Amino acid sequence: MGLALHTTRQDGRATIAARGSIDLHSSDELRSRLTELVDAGERAVVVDLTAVDFCDSSGLNVLVRAYKHARAQNATLTVTGAYGRVENVLRTTGLDRFLIEGPAEEAPADGR
């Protein structure tokens, strides 16, 4: 399965809903979209991974570089909706500490 991206704007933020796999073959498309949004002046960008079933190291690299690019432009980039293998790889690599978005009321009681 490839990668499909759908961008919406609401409440001062742009959300990219990704569907499919983020891997070596599809990560450039995500990188381009994220860069375009930040360069166009979006100050809050969210990547919704709810419908993403796989993310390899090239996908992680795109997310890290986009995060750094956003910070350099005084913008934010966060990830939401990660679950299963995708959430596990974000947590294992430590990227969850600065990428995963979630209001306090959604956080588990044990603080994870």
Regions found by a protein language model. Name each.
Residues 1-53, 65-112:
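STAS-like cytosolic regulatory interaction modules
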Residues 56:
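Conserved G/P- and acidic residue-centered "switch" motifs that form tight phosphate/ATP-binding loops
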